[in-house]
């Protein structure tokens, strides 16, 4: 080879040459092994033309090991099928007469990297080696046995293995025919131009599976794929076909790692359960992964939940479902149309250790198949394993069922044989044996003959290839069924461009012939609207019409009018109930009780005061302001009845007037009293003259002025916003429309209520301030301290009222809670004033009349001086026990005051 083309050829193969130089069989010692002796990792059969073979005799190893357990069906059955086909061709006088086919068969160990390493054996003979620098000990050149030239390869099984091997074989133009690889990627003739297969591409299989899913009325499925070309390409093809055909949505696409960790399959099942409606699982996985998925489903107690649909890697194999029959029941599988080869059954059943020495793995198969050991040294003490006798027979002493791909292995070998036969006929016409034009065989020419073969396969099916090297799509459809305690695969249909499915033959766990559901979304219930999922036309979310919405049509929710709420099933609207506080409501019991008792007590006090109007205690309490205060207390109690009465124009008008008026009257009277006391004592500190406006008439005038301000505000309110009742649908518009209520109430908002009571609160706070300022006045001189205690207690009541009243604004019982809170607070305020200011006086009047006598009169100067000195002395009260200093001082101050001849304004003690 010379010129640019030659250099390009060598540069393209330079990396491979470097790899081969590291490979163990490249050294002369290994190449010098005598022909016909089996290698440790391969079967070598002599012939005029050598075919390569790649089979997964062992599974993938773990913990750094290349190979694992023996695979009896996928490995030994398929390998023996190739040997069986070679024997038939070599014994056929009409096919390749006088030409013997040999073989070099390797174990891929179900791993693409190991298969790559093994397949380097096939290209050794195609690379010439320069041995000029290699000399033996005698100085002569070494004798190197040239490796056999492999003209074509049968295999591999897994798509990922075939892809890896095809990348090397195409460099050396070695045709390859696979018997099991179905990944759509291998149909790319620009990348895998020397690859052909006797099984159809997964593109056909994916279409068939989509047709099955649609026939079963499933529209929501998950996919599960083994990592690698076969699984990932198969799922990708299925998804693509489902999109093209429509009507099928993919819930999840889960990938099984090439080297799964402990617990990985349990996580996969857990993830699949996240979309529990997707009960149908489309599986493109190797049989080891399939089995571990089924085991994980059983551990998760999901037997009967999932409905499996397996690709041809599952097919009708027993290994994935062995002792997992309950979990696998109902599984629908697909397999390229095949027929059991009876001749192979007879051939394989007759294999023994004596007549099958060419298969170097047959002894291992024998031990595994019959559960015995060939060597006594391998038997362990106490073990139940027996020694092999060589009298065991396959199918008699062990179970036997032909593996599903045996037919395709035989067809692949025959396709290679027919291509070589046609090539020999054209290149060596009339010649016996090989002619120079076929020695060596040109791979490019052989590929053309392979693509043009057309013959009846071992099962009678036509064997042909299209321009991409793919076989036509013909599938049988199976279902794994259990009956009477036994399980088996039943043919339920076929697919050849179109689906032919016998649904009446199908059996489902728990439901018999009734089709199980694996649908994206259940029909929406009344009151729910459909919200389609973007990119998934068959899927939708059922979203309930929330809040005050009702269902207009399948896709729309609309809000009810403001005075209506949705019905129970949210298909229409209905009026919102209107509520008010009833007289017989439990919420009205306490306010009415307090009001009735309060009014009775107030009237009792008024009657007592009127009857004993001229007694010293009544006079000393300031009769005029006392009656005003009692009137305010009465109105506070009476307001309760207005608050509970049904709101109308009259009731709402009276509420505006009297709700704040009663409190204003009460606190105006108390404020006038405390202000009078404060001014008297403050004036006394500066002079002996009496302050202004302390007469009863002045006090009444001040009180009515304060009250008139409240009335003036109410009048302005009536003018600006006339009173009326309203039905408030917003106030009790709860989040749950079932509890929504229209509240019949007066047009008094929370803000209006604050303004209405605000003036009364201002009077109350001011009165409290004066009560604090006069707290130091001796209690024997006035009623400032009882007023102070009254105001302190009242403040506490209203401080408790505020959070309760405004904190329940969002409650469904807001009307009841706020009305009850307001009326009880008003009644308690009135009760505090009535109880602390008047009940002690009534008690003395009725039960201790001896105390209802006039007191000594004191001058203003004496009273003020005593109060002032008392305050100062209180700070030093610890110098005299029991307050003796205070009493003594007061008495010392009294004598000069009585003896003086000056005229002072005098007041009775209680009058102050």
From Swiss-Prot:
Subcellular location: Cell membrane
Cystine bridges: 67-109, 249-538, 372-388, 428-435, 520-539, 524-542, 545-557, 560-573
Segments on the Cytoplasmic side according to the record's topology features: 608-624, 672-699, 773-786, 848-912
Residues modified by glycosylation: 98, 301
Cleavable signal peptide: 1-32
Membrane-protein topology: Multi-pass membrane protein
Single annotated GO MF: group III metabotropic glutamate receptor activity
Protein name per Swiss-Prot or TrEMBL: Metabotropic glutamate receptor 4
Assembly: Interacts with PICK1.
Residues exposed to the Extracellular side: 33-586, 646-653, 721-751, 808-826
Keywords recorded for this protein, A-Z: Cell membrane, Disulfide bond, G-protein coupled receptor, Glycoprotein, Membrane, Receptor, Signal, Transducer, Transmembrane, Transmembrane helix
Family designation: Belongs to the G-protein coupled receptor 3 family.
InterPro entries in alphabetical order: ANF_lig-bd_rcpt, GPCR_3, GPCR_3_9-Cys_dom, GPCR_3_9-Cys_sf, GPCR_3_C, GPCR_3_CS, GPCR_3_mGluR4, GPCR_3_mtglu_rcpt
Keyword Cell membrane: yes
Transmembrane segments: 587-607, 625-645, 654-671, 700-720, 752-772, 787-807, 827-847
One Gene Ontology CC term in the entry: cerebellar granule cell to Purkinje cell synapse
Binding-site residues for L-glutamate, renumbered to this chain: 159, 180-182, 230, 312, 405
Lineage: Eukaryota, Metazoa, Chordata, Craniata, Vertebrata
Pfam families (UniProt xref): 7tm_3 (PF00003), ANF_receptor (PF01094), NCD3G (PF07562)
Function: G-protein coupled receptor for glutamate. Ligand binding causes a conformation change that triggers signaling via guanine nucleotide-binding proteins (G proteins) and modulates the activity of down-stream effectors. Signaling inhibits adenylate cyclase activity.
GO terms, biological process: adenylate cyclase-inhibiting G protein-coupled glutamate receptor signaling pathway; chemical synaptic transmission; learning; presynaptic modulation of chemical synaptic transmission
